[in-house]
């Protein structure tokens, strides 16, 4: 009798994606982040659903409804902090996943990579809108500052901002629509994830060497299912350590003060996972220039396949490119640190240098390194 998992129309899809999928035999733990992102998304949807049952998206009650969740709802505090810190874990996994793609040349799978960049932008938009919902000081002022950036668009900017706000400032209408978008976007993300996987399974996974692995494949189950479970356990350990011991470590104390349009916090800054982009935004004195640099800092990922000059796909055997990659990683950490600092000397100059370095490494140094390494191959 034919195996049901191979014949049933629904089970066949699951089987071909998670059970009998031919996978390279040598993929390292850097390939765990895809499944971890799936788990993070599931966790965020579940915790978010339970939070939405008790949250009210009205300016007069939003802050107190979050307080009510933490104080009065059964295990509401753990649901709330798992959702807030789950977002941080989500972004850690996202950045690791993108970094893996850059290092091992996975961006040569064009469709998979482009959908991935769209996913990154969608997740960033979702996280930004989620940060506005508790309606604390940083929620309100973060929403005001970031949405206001759109006013830098020539001619239509001001009208566009007022259209997004639903009035002349961030108010009731803004909060309500942000809640609606924050609720629906994770489901759109889930659909995009399926498209991402669909394109990935057209080509099969990359591997650390960057060499085609068709001659050496193993079934996904049990080898990589057990490996993914280990990754999930490590993720949950890290998440629960954060949630149970220092749930507010990555948050901003200002967000425990209810939103007040008449009182501006001394340092307006987004969540830690946006600080690198925020630092790039602030490093340019011109408003429109800053906004363009901010957008470019993410969309530059779309250029990666065009900037690949090396004859080798992976950086595994390319020491010069490896040095530049880790320099880029250090540069992003520097930008993250600068984004959280006040706009004063010496932080301004450090931020500008780090921003120039970011674009220089990606647009100039890495392609040049690839060409140099091609020359070295002939020696």
From Swiss-Prot:
Binding site for heme b b566: 97, 196
Bilayer topology: Multi-pass membrane protein
Annotated positions binding a ubiquinone: 201
Membrane-spanning residues: 33-53, 77-98, 113-133, 178-198, 226-246, 288-308, 320-340, 347-367
Binding, heme b b562: 83, 182
Subcellular location(s) per record: Mitochondrion inner membrane
GO biological process, one term: mitochondrial electron transport, ubiquinol to cytochrome c
GO molecular function: metal ion binding; ubiquinol-cytochrome-c reductase activity
Cofactor: binding comment: Binds 2 heme b groups non-covalently.
Cofactor dependency: heme b
Keywords in alphabetical order: Electron transport, Heme, Iron, Membrane, Metal-binding, Mitochondrion, Mitochondrion inner membrane, Respiratory chain, Transmembrane, Transmembrane helix, Transport, Ubiquinone
Tagged with keyword Iron: yes
Pfam families cross-referenced by the UniProt entry: Cytochrom_B_C, Cytochrome_B
GO cellular component, one term: respiratory chain complex III
Biological role: Component of the ubiquinol-cytochrome c reductase complex (complex III or cytochrome b-c1 complex) that is part of the mitochondrial respiratory chain. The b-c1 complex mediates electron transfer from ubiquinol to cytochrome c. Contributes to the generation of a proton gradient across the mitochondrial membrane that is then used for ATP synthesis.
Complex and partners: The cytochrome bc1 complex contains 11 subunits: 3 respiratory subunits (MT-CYB, CYC1 and UQCRFS1), 2 core proteins (UQCRC1 and UQCRC2) and 6 low-molecular weight proteins (UQCRH/QCR6, UQCRB/QCR7, UQCRQ/QCR8, UQCR10/QCR9, UQCR11/QCR10 and a cleavage product of UQCRFS1). This cytochrome bc1 complex then forms a dimer.
UniProt record similarity statement: Belongs to the cytochrome b family.
PANTHER family: CYTOCHROME B (PTHR19271:SF16)
Remarks, miscellaneous: Heme 1 (or BL or b562) is low-potential and absorbs at about 562 nm, and heme 2 (or BH or b566) is high-potential and absorbs at about 566 nm.
Official protein name in the record: Cytochrome b
Species, as recorded: Tragulus javanicus (Lesser Malay chevrotain)
Species lineage: Eukaryota, Metazoa, Chordata, Craniata, Vertebrata
